[in-house]
């Protein structure tokens, strides 16, 4: 490939798993000057983009890449890529958690059924894992509000088969060749 008679090399594909802290936005730049996830990977030479989004107040697993085809496959609803969150909500929802498993009516329609597991109820809050395959704006927070239990903290702990493991918050690692091939094979 040439541009203005000069050969142009295709940029090397890069695949990064980031443990995003709360307080960063999942965009390339912010007109309001807030910190972005790219600030956390400033030493990466290639121009990468977040695969999907995590809210400003949400922490956890975020993939960054310059592979547009893979980004499409991982974010398009038809591919139903599962994402698991560690959710802490106010109060003790009990039976209301079953509503999450049946789907919840939000302002933009009914959600697909979610999977709720590892529930730990305390006096003032309840923690559980929630797995969804949709990626609507602030979906987990809105689902929990819809059952009357606002989110206190939210962390994505799994994206497809990828997990944070012991990766410290604010740090990243490159995906292995096997992980990349497995992601590409999801769709």
Model-derived regions, located:
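Basic, flexible Lys/Arg- and Gly-enriched helix-loop patches that mediate nucleic-acid binding at interfaces
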Residues: 1-187
